[in-house]
Amino acid sequence: MKTYTYSKQDLSFIEQLSQAYCKDPFSYLGLHQAGDVSVIRVFLPEATTVKILSADGQILSEALKIDDSGLFVAQLSQQYSSLNYRLRVGYSLAEIDLEDPYRFTSSLLPMDNWLLAEGTHLRPYEILGAHLKTQEGVSGVHFSVWAPNARRVSVVGDFNYWDGRVNPMRFHAESGIWDIFLPNVEKGALYKFEILDSNGNIRLKSDPYAFASQFRPDTASVVTGLPEKIEVDAKLRHANEPDQPISIYEVHLGSWRRHLENNYWLNYEEIANELIPYVKDMGFTHIELLPITEYPFDGSWGYQPTGLYSPTSRFGSPDDLRTLIRKAHEAGINVILDWVVGHFPTDSHGLTEFDGSHLYEHQDPREGYHQDWNTLIFNYGRHEVFNYLSSNALYWTERFGIDGLRVDAVSSMIYRDYSRKDGEWIPNQYGGRENLEALDFLRRTNRMLKKEGHGAVVIAEESTSFAGITHSPTENGVGFDYKWNMGWMNDTLRYMSLDPIYRQYHHDWMTFGMMYQYSEKFVLPLSHDEVVHGKCSILGKMSGDCWQKFANLRAYYGYMWGYPGKKLLFMGNEFAQGREWNYNESLDWFLLGEQGGGWHKGVLNWVRDLNRTYQKYPALYQLDYDPAGFEWLVVDDWQQSVFAFERKAKNGESVIVVSNFTPVVRHNYRIGVRQDGTYTEILNSDAAYYEGSNVGNYGEIECEAIESHGKPFSIELSIPPLSTIFIACQPKPKEAVEAEQDIVKMAEVAMQKALKPTKKTVSVKAKAHKKAHKNKK
């Protein structure tokens, strides 16, 4: 074909393609019918020649370059409804054979489009994003992205020299999705979506559904396979249940431990080899990871993510992360992920104004902008946004084996007026302050995970008294499994900061939590938020001199581990790091050596033994959320700042926890108990092993049948200064109790017999009485 007659269609598409605003490239490029013949149109701006090859490599036609912009047209000698062909493309320095992306049909099914538009696709990440696949025997990558208001979307990457003119995508008007299959693109390729918005602006965006991303400061997405599903270990997931011991070690992977020589991060493999044995030895049951979804700014700690489906590349590949989680599971440790779905950053490569419109966020800043964090708030009421977020929960549990999600900043999600003044927020449709769309998102996501998550749990960081956070949606609750008890944490830390002489006036700060203990399923958190921004370390919050600070801390941890609720401790707190947490440095592990003077090692040993005791005695965890599992024994001794309570197991066994928050030893302190038995001191925060003063009860404690505190029995204790002690009760065996009861009955019978008068005694008494009566007369 040496001459070519331009049609109006040609002229229109030449302009659209050369100016890069073609919205429907598949209607023109590739194989098409033209009267009695077929034509193949190819747009390659940098090419000099194009030949059409058959499947076996024969030249079918040589294309004519009909425009300097790079449009080639080849006419075939006959009609083809479909044709397996290739392109031989000549460039200035070489000639290479290529597949034509515009000969492949869309792999998006009508049902996919319908479900995605409706926001009910359970696993949209199996469709959207970049997926390695084979079409018609050709390997490549299927790209798809939701951008309903864009004029044109192209895939750009190192495979097409980041030229947005080369691979414009197919638009599906019914769903707003763009897609294209690019042959011969391989795993590891870098890519983005180049979006022409309705105002003519070019936006270069990372893939919202990317499974891997470049290392910051670069922002491209990386082609990688969708991770395979992880087989769920039912035994591990059972460890998430409310009647199981849950002790969570909260970790920031970038600062738990670093290479000493260059202060650089450990990678996922190194973390697995060091962190997991440590956590296992310390007796923690769960690891909670601060956010590891891709994020651009180290100083956000991961709480401003740009890639919810992409594990951060800071520490390695997605497969490396899966290996870390697998090794944790092999050690019997569950893994919880901090999940940030309340807001996202304003970085230009991220979700902000994704297709030129406010696609993921609200348009009105009174709904869509978070002024505290300079972030944007998701529009939960939009079907596709809901689907994007909700399915992400399933992605992490199914594809990485994550055992639970801790949802960040729930309060900021469910209140429209969160951290806003009057006039800075918009009421809901009923005039209220609740974000009904966010609540619906949380309820539906929690319900979905209950059904599909195979025992994965969801934990709320919710700092208000919003009712029903852990209640079922069928009871008008939100459906979380657990909620952080921020009130308990704030009250008790405030108490511990006081000089002991003033604690007597604020006794209720340690007891008030029981007033609402059974309103939710609580986790007691000492998280990363409490050791940053000038708040001091947990050790730094304790009052007193060095000895008192460490004694206070050990006593406080003991009180916490005895108190109802699951436990959470941020890294470094287990050995009483003295300074605030710094995300850019390793923890101060040197404190466990001679430089720590033994104090920090003592706290480490105490936390380890607390965890082991906690797991050993069901009384300390089985009935956390049942009033039958807790009873105050001493609640009103404010003058001596002593607290005592009994924790009970389902089988009736119990552990007594006693705390003394003054530096005065309480000798001969009597506490009433409900049953006779053998009482043994099993833990004492003042033991020399923990660097205490070694005051205690040294094993077995005598139980006496002396009433105290309304109980029929009592024990007399020596309560060390600034301490918490744990006392296990082994009730007397039933046979022994019955034998004692028999002895008591026999003694009572003998006593009654001894006191009952005999016939001779009665006769003598009668005669004496008769004689006395006669004398009286």
Swiss-Prot record:
GO molecular-function annotation terms? 1,4-alpha-glucan branching enzyme activity; cation binding; hydrolase activity, hydrolyzing O-glycosyl compounds
Pathway-wise, it operates in: Glycan biosynthesis; glycogen biosynthesis
Which residues constitute the catalytic centre?
D408 (nucleophile), E461 (proton donor)
Signal peptide location in the record? none
Q: Does the keyword Glycosyltransferase apply?
A: yes
In terms of Pfam families, this protein maps to: Alpha-amylase (PF00128), Alpha-amylase_C (PF02806), CBM_48 (PF02922), GlgB_N (PF22019)
SMART domains found in the cross-reference section:
Aamy
Keyword Cell membrane tagged: no
Q: List the catalysed reactions.
A: Transfers a segment of a (1->4)-alpha-D-glucan chain to a primary hydroxy group in a similar glucan chain
Q: Name one GO cellular component term.
A: cytosol
Q: What is its EC number?
A: 2.4.1.18
Q: Which Gene3D superfamilies match?
A: Glycosidases, Golgi alpha-mannosidase II, Immunoglobulins
A single Gene Ontology biological process assigned to it is: glycogen biosynthetic process
Where in the chain are disulfide-linked cysteines found? none
**Keyword line:** Carbohydrate metabolism, Glycogen biosynthesis, Glycogen metabolism, Glycosyltransferase, Transferase
Q: How does it assemble?
A: Monomer.
> What family is it from?
Belongs to the glycosyl hydrolase 13 family. GlgB subfamily.
Matching HAMAP family: GlgB (MF_00685)
What exactly does this protein do? Catalyzes the formation of the alpha-1,6-glucosidic linkages in glycogen by scission of a 1,4-alpha-linked oligosaccharide from growing alpha-1,4-glucan chains and the subsequent attachment of the oligosaccharide to the alpha-1,6 position.
Which NCBIfam families does this one have?
A: branching_enzym, PRK05402.1, PRK12313.1
What is this protein's record name?
1,4-alpha-glucan branching enzyme GlgB
Q: What is the originating organism of this protein? A: Actinobacillus pleuropneumoniae serotype 3 (strain JL03)
